[in-house]
C-alpha cells in the first residue's frame, strides 16, 4: 500500500485518517523511534503486532483514537524499550471494542504505565498479555473481565507484578494454565494478590485448565472457596510454590 512505501522511505508525517489496518507496521524495525503520536487512528480496526520487536520505540501515543480497534494482539510484544514515552496518557485509550489482547505486552521490559481505566468488557483473550514483563506492576483490579475465556500464561514470569485482582469476574474463564508461573527454583514470581485474600472470591466454575498456575510462585492466599468442579488438569499447580500453605480440603 502507499502508506507502507512511505513508511519504508522514512516518511512518517502522514495523513492516516483513512487507514484501517496497522498490522505489523513497525514490526522488527529495531531503529524506529519517531514521534507518531499525532496520527489519526480513528478508523483503524486492527493493530496486530504493530510494534512487535520494535526494540527502540518509546514515544507517547496516548492521544491516539483507538475507539474502532478490535484487536491489539501482540501490539507491543518484544518492544523492549516501550513505556509510552514515560507518559501515563495511554490510560486514556478507548479499548471498548477490543476483543483480543493476547500477548499485547509480552516481553516488554520497560512498560509500567497505568492502564487501569481501560474498558476491557469485550476482551475474550488475555493469554500471555503480561508474560515476561520486568517492570509492569500497575493496578488493573477494576478491569471488566467478564467475557475473558483465556487467561493462560497471562502473568507467566511477570517478575514484579503483585496487585489485587480479586474483584475480577472470572466466570467465563476456561483456561488459567501457567497464569502466574515462575521459571523454577530460585526464580519465582512474586504474585500474592497484593497481599489480599479477595482472590478467594473468584468464580472458577468454568476453568478446565489450571496446570502450573502457581508453579514457582510466592503465592499464599486462601483459595479454599474456589469451585474446581470443571477442572481436568491441575498438574504441577503448586509445584515449587514454596510459600503456599492453605486449606484446600473443601
Q: Would you name each region that the model predicts?
A:
Residues 1-250:
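Negatively charged
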Amino acid at each position: 500500500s502507499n502508506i507502507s512505501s512511505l513508511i519504508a522511505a522514512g516518511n512518517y508525517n502522514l495523513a492516516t485518517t483513512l487507514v484501517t489496518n496497522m498490522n505489523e507496521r513497525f514490526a522488527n524495525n529495531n531503529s524506529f523511534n519517531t514521534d507518531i503520536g499525532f496520527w489519526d487512528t480513528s478508523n483503524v480496526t486492527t493493530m496486530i503486532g504493530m510494534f512487535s520487536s520494535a526494540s527502540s520505540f518509546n514515544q507517547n501515543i496516548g492521544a491516539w483514537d483507538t475507539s474502532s480497534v478490535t484487536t491489539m494482539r501482540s501490539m507491543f510484544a518484544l518492544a523492549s524499550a516501550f513505556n509510552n514515552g514515560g507518559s501515563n496518557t495511554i490510560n486514556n485509550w478507548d479499548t471498548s471494542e477490543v476483543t483480543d489482547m493476547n500477548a499485547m505486552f509480552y516481553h516488554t521490559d520497560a512498560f509500567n504505565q497505568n492502564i487501569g481505566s481501560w474498558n476491557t468488557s469485550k476482551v475474550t483473550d488475555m493469554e500471555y498479555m503480561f508474560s515476561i514483563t520486568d517492570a509492569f506492576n500497575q493496578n488493573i483490579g477494576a478491569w471488566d473481565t467478564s467475557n475473558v475465556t483465556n487467561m493462560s500464561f497471562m502473568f507467566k514470569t511477570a517478575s514484579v507484578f503483585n496487585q489485587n485482582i480479586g474483584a475480577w469476574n472470572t466466570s467465563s474463564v476456561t483456561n488459567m494454565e501457567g497464569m502466574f508461573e515462575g521459571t523454577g527454583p530460585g526464580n519465582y514470581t512474586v504474585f500474592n494478590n497484593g497481599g489480599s485474600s479477595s482472590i478467594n472470591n473468584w468464580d472458577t466454575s468454568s476453568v478446565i485448565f489450571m496446570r502450573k498456575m502457581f508453579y514457582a510462585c510466592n503465592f499464599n492466599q486462601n483459595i479454599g472457596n474456589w469451585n474446581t468442579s470443571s477442572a481436568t488438569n491441575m498438574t504441577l499447580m503448586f509445584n515449587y510454590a514454596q510459600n503456599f500453605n492453605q486449606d484446600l480440603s473443601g
